[in-house]
Amino acid sequence: MKMTPLMEQYLKIKEQYKDSILLFRLGDFYEAFFEDAKTVSKVLNIVLTKRQDAPMAGIPYHALNTYLKKLVEAGYKVAICDQMEEPSKSKKLIRREVTRVVTPGAIVEDEFLSETNNYMVVLVREKEKYCAVFCDVSTGEVLIHESIDEQEVLDLMKAYSVSEIVCPEGLESEVREKLPGVYIEVIDEWYFSEPEEEVKRIYGIEDIHHFELSSLAMKSLSALIKYIKYTMISEKLNLKPPVTISRKNFMILDSATVENLSLIPGEKGKNLFDVLNHTETPMGARLLKKWILHPLTDRQQIEDRLNAVEKLKEDRLKLEQIRNLLSRVRDVERIVSRVEYNRAIPRDLVALRETLSVVPELNEELSNFDFFEKLNFPDSLFDLLCKAIEDDPAGSPGEGKVIKRGFSPELDEYRDLLEHSEEKLKEFEEREREKTGIQKLKVGYNQVFGYYIEVTKANLDKVPEDYERKQTLVNSERFTTPELKEFETKIMAAKERIEELEKELFRNVCEEVKKHKETLLEISEELARIDVLATLAYDAILYNYTRPTFSEDRMEIIGGRHPVVERFTRDFVENDLYMDDEKRFTVITGPNMSGKSTFIRQVGLISLMAQIGSFVPAKKAVLPVFDRIFTRMGARDDLAGGRSTFLVEMNEMALILLKATKKSLVLLDEVGRGTGTQDGISIAWAISEELISRGCKVLFATHFIELTNLENSFPQVQNKTILVKEEGSNVVFTHRVVDGVADRSYGADRSYGIEVARIAGIPENVIRRAFEIMEKGFKTKSQRKNGKVKKFSQQIPLFPA
């Protein structure tokens, strides 16, 4: 294949981005060549063509984001190569450069993103210590977590639903195994060089010690900065100062607890976030999720939030006015990011203007609340946005009106020329008709031939000599004249100049926005906080929640409810619980579907909600401030990891036994069920003894009736059961938690499991047969050597999972 200058240019750029699909701007299309073209054609289902024997596939430039999204979602890294000069102004080969590298975590455009955070993470291990630096490029947020506990770091990555992991080569295989399906980018040692200088440069500070980062965290942050520079092709980044996630301030939740308590949207459907999320702003929704994932452990900070929620709840009129104002607020964080990376569109600036218009009114409404800081109002920027940007602008500068009339005299002059062009064309047309006597003479325009005079074949004999032929059609011919040519030159120059001016003026306005970045981010942060606190106040009113109070060791819940289940269940049954240092271990027995699991989950959720600063679903709640909430629930296997249900169960229990302290809350459901009955009881008993000795608060829901005997050996243990009533042949699950032990008297003569099967809709003939088998078969098998029948009351019969 003969190498043209264009293809040489392409190959030179492609050499620098070998691991990316290169989309190369050619006029109105982005083209991919060679293997990239085959990939693009296959993924996007577009035609594969050829250019000089090179496979080629193209997408229209105006539809770039639509196709780009599909490529990134398919797991590809894409380098965008743009034309850096106007084709009309260059007689040589147009200069082209890569303007960005798109990966799942390096995205700022709204089309790609939901309201939730889109985190990438730089993961580094040094000796036995891990450092994870999370960054949402679209908001500029940076979070750092260090730990010697690999599982803790993995849990955080799962909770944050990271879209991209950036790590050194030595970690790649481990990460792929532990987090399959997540996009991974491997980086070399250069990314970790000169860390302090890199951090100083990007944050524009000389003293970085107030960040209080370890050398490992500093290196990891530096790697993040260099990687974002590489993807955004920019030396200036929109990054907020790093925030450290530590146990000193926050509760660290493992992935099992996040999943078992259904805290955030996932595979299990209804969740706490969806119930509480009545936020009015995208920033507020993201912050609420963060609060749920990181409950506070400092009592004063919790009380501060609760005080704010209570004050807002008490003044319903103000609360409604505040929420109405917040509903006009747009996603300031992401707008600032797009402006910083030169990805903003005119509608972003309109949204920013709308948000700023709310600030003075909001300041007025918040003036009575001392827990809110007065929002800074950038008057000059607001005035500029009001004067410069149209209310309903075109999609991008140069595509139509973006800059308001009156902002630029030069732009107005060219617009006047264009707007009066139709009028002038009509005048020209009338003059030519009079001059030639051709009444059907028309002046028109098309993109190929420009402006023309059209004359029918019947009138060709009247055409003057100064008419220059441009095009012959079936029934007519088209001409031009020196006057029409001059008019066309002026019009085309005006259009071109309008496009140039609009782009230039829009860039200037964006530069002014950049100067106010810090103020805008402060406004965004405070708006998010106001939104979440107002939402929690609204939830408290809507759902009839109560303010919790705190105690060193006492847990007293009266009329407690499950915040999620009650939303989708009629006549939810409230329950009470009392625990303290003397009675800190509660064993709960009862048949399936009686409500054991719901009860222990609601205790966990009430505790967690209190520590995010929310009112809680109870008539009264006195709670300790827990350092951790642990859960071990349900039968789950790990087919991908090759772990059985029982092994998963024991792995999770090992984590709890390793980390639970006197200040922890431990919720256990069916521990020991994944193995044989005797093994299971023995393990469950031994685990219980260990947790009792630790001094943590424990709720243990079980079918092992033997565990109720713990009460006889340990004064810290109390037994609870779920009250079940029988009405004739039917079983009624009251869902009421009472003192005592599940009724042993039924033994093998009665199975609630079969009743559960009946409720689930198993046919009646199958139910009758199950009772027959239970009566005949199980009794025969359970004969002791001495001829006596062994009672099966030792384990409450289960409906098979």
From Swiss-Prot:
Residue numbers binding ATP: G590, P591, N592, M593, S594, G595, K596, S597
Keyword DNA-binding assigned: yes
Superkingdom per UniProt: Bacteria
Listed GO MF terms: ATP binding; ATP-dependent DNA damage sensor activity; damaged DNA binding; mismatched DNA binding
An individual GO BP term: mismatch repair
Pfam families assigned: MutS_I (PF01624), MutS_II (PF05188), MutS_III (PF05192), MutS_IV (PF05190), MutS_V (PF00488)
Annotated Gene Ontology cellular component terms: cytosol
Keywords assigned by UniProt, alphabetized: ATP-binding, DNA damage, DNA repair, DNA-binding, Nucleotide-binding
Keyword ATP-binding: yes
SUPFAM superfamilies noted in UniProt: DNA repair protein MutS, domain I (SSF55271), DNA repair protein MutS, domain II (SSF53150), DNA repair protein MutS, domain III (SSF48334), P-loop containing nucleoside triphosphate hydrolases (SSF52540)
Family: Belongs to the DNA mismatch repair MutS family.
Function in brief: This protein is involved in the repair of mismatches in DNA. It is possible that it carries out the mismatch recognition step. This protein has a weak ATPase activity.
Protein's UniProt name: DNA mismatch repair protein MutS
Natural source organism: Thermotoga neapolitana (strain ATCC 49049 / DSM 4359 / NBRC 107923 / NS-E)
Taxonomic lineage: Bacteria, Thermotogati, Thermotogota, Thermotogae, Thermotogales
Gene symbol of the encoding locus: mutS
